């Protein structure tokens, strides 16, 4: 079975690429639409400039950013952006399904807790067990 072509609210990726930010904002959910209408912050503009240069092939270094609140736009699709999670830069490969989400959603800030085996004294019943 062939893979279904990606569409965002009925528009193909090519159609989304040709849209202006204002036209794209109309398709996004309210929070993202409101954020785009307020305008991009200087950090977001700097990141967008780097992304556009990388797409043209003029920016060779990996794109690293602390800007977790940047909305993923169609022009970012296909790039790998390194997003800071508070400790290190996590590589995020942008796919068409991510359009409209924030970069920070794909770089978790907290590690999942992995508990080891409980030690002596961890439970009431193991308090009085001889240690050897």
UniProtKB/Swiss-Prot annotation:
Keyword list, A-Z: Ribonucleoprotein, Ribosomal protein, RNA-binding, rRNA-binding
Keyword Acyltransferase: no
GO biological process, one term: translation
Nucleotide-binding is among the record's keywords: no
PROSITE patterns xrefs: RIBOSOMAL_S19 (PS00323)
Pfam families: Ribosomal_S19
A GO cellular component annotation in the UniProt record: cytosolic small ribosomal subunit
GO MF assignments: rRNA binding; structural constituent of ribosome
Annotated family: Belongs to the universal ribosomal protein uS19 family.
Biological function: Protein S19 forms a complex with S13 that binds strongly to the 16S ribosomal RNA.
Name of the protein in its database record: Small ribosomal subunit protein uS19
Biological source species: Pyrococcus horikoshii (strain ATCC 700860 / DSM 12428 / JCM 9974 / NBRC 100139 / OT-3)
């Amino acid at each position: 079975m062939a893979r279904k072509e990606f569409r965002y609210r009925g528009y193909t990726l090519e159609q989304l690429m040709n849209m202006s930010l204002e036209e794209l904002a109309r398709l996004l959910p309210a929070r993202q639409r409101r954020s785009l209408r307020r305008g991009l912050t200087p950090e977001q503009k700097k990141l967008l400039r780097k992304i556009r240069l990388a797409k043209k092939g003029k920016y060779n270094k990996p794109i690293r950013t602390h800007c977790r609140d940047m909305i993923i736009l169609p022009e970012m699709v296909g790039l790998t952006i390194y997003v800071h999670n508070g400790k290190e830069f996590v590589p995020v490969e942008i796919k068409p399904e991510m359009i409209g989400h924030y970069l920070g959603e794909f770089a978790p800030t907290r590690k999942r807790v992995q508990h080891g085996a409980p030690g002596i004294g961890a439970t009431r019943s193991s308090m009085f067990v001889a240690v050897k």
